[in-house]
Amino acid sequence: MLKFIIPTIMLMPLTWLSKNNLIWINSTAHSLLISFSSLLLLNQLNDNSLNYSLIFFSDPLSTPLLMLTMWLLPLMLMASQSHLIKEPPVRKKLYITMLIMLQALLIMTFTATELILFYIMFEATLIPTLIIITRWGNQTERLNAGLYFLFYTLIGSLPLLVALVYLQNTTGSLNFLLLQHWAKPLSASWSNIFMWLACMMAFLVKMPLYGLHLWLPKAHVEAPIAGSMVLAAVLLKLGGYGMLRITSMLNPLTEHMAYPFLMLSLWGMIMTSSICLRQTDLKSLIAYSSVSHMALVIAAILIQTPWSYMGATALMIAHGLTSSMLFCLANSNYERIHSRTMILARGLQVLLPLMATWWLLASLTNLALPPTINLVGELLVVMSVFSWSNPTILLMGANIVITALYTLYMLIMTQRGKHTHHINNIIPSFTREHALMALHIIPLLLLSLNPKIILGPLY
């Protein structure tokens, strides 16, 4: 595992010692090399996890998430270049250092064997993200957004620490690989119910569950482009990863406790999709759509069948690449028009025809068109939820229809229509942006050729 962590950490001195005109080239090129080295993780045995040492391991659940994390750093660096063009070199280097630090912490989160190490890294990812949002965000509301983000996640995850200390005292170990075999079946007593809530709440806030999701649109809208990308693509997946890991220790209580949360996520899925239809702000629309996609993942994880687990992991990876691409597209619009309001950015197909192609592809993957892995994930989730309870097909069907509606709305509002007076002279799209979109969409399409690598440990 050190072959990923040490090169990532060594990107920091590389950035600080680069000449001013080579900052972006050096950091992007070397982070791309690191992300290609992550392909080595795919070479795994079918029946077991790879234990690198006592503290790091990877199995078919954490491997795709790890690869997504490493793949995202060069993309974030590519996306941030024009955002930081007016900043002095020291601040550029500081920004890049924050992103690198975030990636190192995420790698350690996804590979930790020890639950306390997982918790510490899970909390530590908060710090660079918060600095990125509150320092480089666009409006002054970014401080408010940072406050929401900080307190929602901290209040959610404090009970988790208490629960972990309790687990350590009762079982004597917090190793994932041991606890799966040692954990005593939890009965439905009051203390166990609170224990279950304490374990799950941190991840439900991070996912976010409908009702605990208010920090997410705020943080997304105010964050700079790299902040939005890493928040949508990886930080939401931390919640899903933690839930998948910790539910195996909370049985059979989960079957008893999951009902309110299942209902909340299924209802919240419809609600957030409907909220998307009334959005004026482009980034806010994409943020709410990712809440509705993550609600599917919560429902799938709480049902706890092999199919739903496979659907949840597939949907997490697919959503990571898709929503990250949508945020990049929204940002490329924002850099030209300096407004996120959709009414002011109409008719861009005439002005930026190739960008319209990327918009179309991103929208189609967002509404889960057949060849993509989004469809694989959604089908598995819908089938497993249907076999858990038949009437849920109404909610699922409604959600799929509304998803198609708001995606179409987003596409038509940005690409079609009569363009407004103030965008007659905008900059053409750069090769860098096209490369960025291609690097998002190519992995999505390639994964649809062989989806079994992202179907998780139960495949």
Curated annotation (Swiss-Prot):
Its main location: mitochondrion. It is found in: Mitochondrion inner membrane. The chain crosses the membrane at residues 22-42, 60-80, 92-112, 113-133, 147-167, 193-213, 224-244, 257-277, 284-303, 307-329, 350-370, 393-413, 435-455. It comes from the Eukaryota. GO terms for cellular component: mitochondrial inner membrane. One of its GO terms (biological process) is mitochondrial respiratory chain complex I assembly. InterPro entries: NADH4_N (IPR000260), NADH_Q_OxRdtase_chainM/4 (IPR010227), NADH_UbQ_OxRdtase (IPR003918), ND/Mrp_TM (IPR001750). Core subunit of respiratory chain NADH dehydrogenase (Complex I) which is composed of 45 different subunits. This is NADH-ubiquinone oxidoreductase chain 4. It comes from Balaenoptera musculus (Blue whale).
